[in-house]
Amino acid sequence: MEMTEMTSVSLKRGSVAIEDNDSVAPAEEAKRQKVSGCCPTTGQDGIENSSLPSSEKVPGPPETAEQGEKNSEVPSEEEEEEDGLSEEEEEEEEEAESFADMMKHGLTELDVGITKFVSSHQGFSGILKERYSDFVVHEIGRDGRISHLSDLSVPVDEEDPSEDVFTVLTAEEKQRLEELQLFKNKETSVAIEVIEDTKEKRTIIHQAIKSLFPGLETKTEDREGKKYIVAYHAAGKKALANPRKHSWPKSRGSYCHFVLYKENKDTMDAINLLSKYLRVKPNIFSYMGTKDKRAITVQEIAVLKITAQRLAHLNKCLMNFKLGNFSYQKNPLKLGELQGNHFTVVLRNITGTDNQVEQAMNSLKEIGFINYYGMQRFGTTAVPTYQVGRAILQNSWAEVMDLILKPRSGAEKGYLVKCREEWAKSKDPAAALRKLPVKRCVEGQLLRGLSKYGMKNIVSAFGIIPRNNRLMYIHSYQSYVWNNMVSKRIDEYGLKPVPGDLVLKGATATFIEEDDVNNYSIHDVVMPLPGFDVIYPKHKISEAYREMLTADNLDIDNMRHKIRDYSLSGAYRKIIIRPQNVSWEVVAYDDPKIPLFNTDVDNLEGRPPPVFASEGKYRALKMDFSLPPSTYATMAIREVLKMDTSIKNQTQLNTTWLR
């Protein structure tokens, strides 16, 4: 292996959280991560979510759609503070000053063990994610097909109400019905006058109320010579908790599957927004993996007993969202069922020659890249998430509390700064909590726990944080160890399998012996994430694992924790990933703001693909590649450009944002 000089890439603010390949552990991580005897509900990255806990709203672990059926139409008690997609420009303006300051104190790749490259080509620079539309992710489904939004039509279904259902009620009538549905006032019924009294008109109003406001019954009444449709609760609050199962045709699958196209919004925020518009709980939605915010992403979603017609109607209401490719099926989707993701990435204003680009992309196609856990795994603030995870594993609960709540270098939202300052001054969880307008962030949840259980019971207080988010801290520590050990392995033995390396046979890890080393390639070699149910290589790297954990006051021979949730069995992960379906082209352009390829929505609207001149002011590299779950597109791009992908490094390189 040849180490080459690292070059740089300029990044727009906020663009480092590049999509990692989501869902549960992939085939090569066949040794599944076990926590308390079962896999955690997973999200973005494989063993767990890769979007690590931060000072944002933290949704709890999603229930399955089956679990949500009993209360599937109950509006969430805690609605989102925002009811729509905020404009990208507004977000950037709001955060512009704080971001560069915050990133001065962030992590670099060196801090988390990312130090090696596999290729020998000369690196070059480029601008990554100058626009979120320069990064497009298409989910690869269970059947191996890449998800595309290609059809906005609604399946023909005799049971579906007419389009008039969505327009027959006035805004005032909808408001009154919603208040009735949610028991927001003392009214026991709402009467809608039928202006044009025909049977067809009355039928449409009945259908509209029952379709748009599940849990309400309707009847027709004559009042002083006028016809009214009266809406009411048939069985009190139980009707709302147990919606009209009898209204769903038995011949139709219980789940409406659809393709969700979204721009600049992460999956959980998208689900929460859809839930709000549909007036249902988020737990009736299911999906195979979550997608990050700063990108255009296309993925399959399933929802319990919501018609395609209702979903399609949202296309008229929501910006930067499109729903389509509807079908009714018997089963929901499950986390981890996807086969991976296909990425389309534009690197703008590249400096590399055509020959450099060719060498870099051929190396990516033929050799691949080191399967490091990307920077987003470790958080973006001055307190890395792996440090919290290490403290949990050490049973250092006072340190866990301190790391999450103490003041930290770099800019944060003002209310968080005030909350941390109050905590440092008073150590009063109730007083610090009062500084937070949004109490669903990790800090708010921990402070609530401390208020409830007291300062002497930090373990229980920490337990208020949703389980997945707690586990992400310790998974971050495992990832930190794995990155460092893989760098040592490649530094010590290069890019060839050696005796003592580990490979998987089915789900079982075995050692490569001297006489069968030629039967394997570097693409077969795996390395363990530390845990109580893994084996370690039989060469120098085994001792390196032991030394690293010993330095962190952890016993590699006893990775069981006194709290079951934090006893990690470990897992295996391939050290080199070779992307599939790799293609690329270099294009010339003059305007940094023009899109360089069509999206699914562009194609639906019949827009012609961009035409490029043979020469232009700038050059861009357009890359396409597919990755299995639990791999990071950032690390593939890093290998091509020979760059440090950390936000801290890119902020130092690019302090003036290109607009």
UniProtKB/Swiss-Prot annotation:
Gene: PUS7
Recorded family membership: Belongs to the pseudouridine synthase TruD family.
Signal peptide: none
Top EC class of this enzyme: isomerase
SUPFAM superfamilies to which the protein is assigned, alphabetical: Pseudouridine synthase (SSF55120)
Residues with PTM N-acetylmethionine: M1
Keyword Isomerase attached: yes
Pfam families: TruD
Listed EC numbers: 5.4.99.-
Polar residues bias: start-end ranges: 1-10, 39-54
Keywords assigned by UniProt, alphabetized: Acetylation, Isomerase, mRNA processing, mRNA splicing, Nucleus, Phosphoprotein, tRNA processing
GO biological process: mRNA processing; mRNA pseudouridine synthesis; negative regulation of translation; pseudouridine synthesis; regulation of hematopoietic stem cell differentiation; regulation of mesoderm development; RNA splicing; tRNA pseudouridine synthesis
Keyword Cell inner membrane: no
Record field: catalytic activity: a uridine in tRNA = a pseudouridine in tRNA; uridine(13) in tRNA = pseudouridine(13) in tRNA; a uridine in mRNA = a pseudouridine in mRNA
Compartmental location: Nucleus
GO MF term set: pseudouridine synthase activity; RNA binding; tRNA pseudouridine(13) synthase activity
Domain TRUD: 368-578
Modified residues (Phosphoserine): S10, S125
Family matches, as PROSITE patterns: TRUD, UPF0024
Domain of life from the UniProt record: Eukaryota
Record's GO cellular component terms: nucleus
Function: Pseudouridylate synthase that catalyzes pseudouridylation of RNAs. Acts as a regulator of protein synthesis in embryonic stem cells by mediating pseudouridylation of RNA fragments derived from tRNAs (tRFs): pseudouridylated tRFs inhibit translation by targeting the translation initiation complex. Also catalyzes pseudouridylation of mRNAs: mediates pseudouridylation of mRNAs with the consensus sequence 5'-UGUAG-3'. Acts as a regulator of pre-mRNA splicing by mediating pseudouridylation of pre-mRNAs at locations associated with alternatively spliced regions.
Composition bias type Acidic residues, residue spans: 75-98
Quaternary assembly: Interacts with SIRT1.
Record InterPro entries: PsdUridine_synth_cat_dom_sf (IPR020103), PsdUridine_synth_TruD (IPR001656), PsdUridine_synth_TruD_CS (IPR020119), PsdUridine_synth_TruD_insert (IPR011760), TruD_catalytic (IPR042214)
Protein name per the record: Pseudouridylate synthase 7 homolog
Organism the protein comes from: Bos taurus
Active site annotation, chain numbering: D292
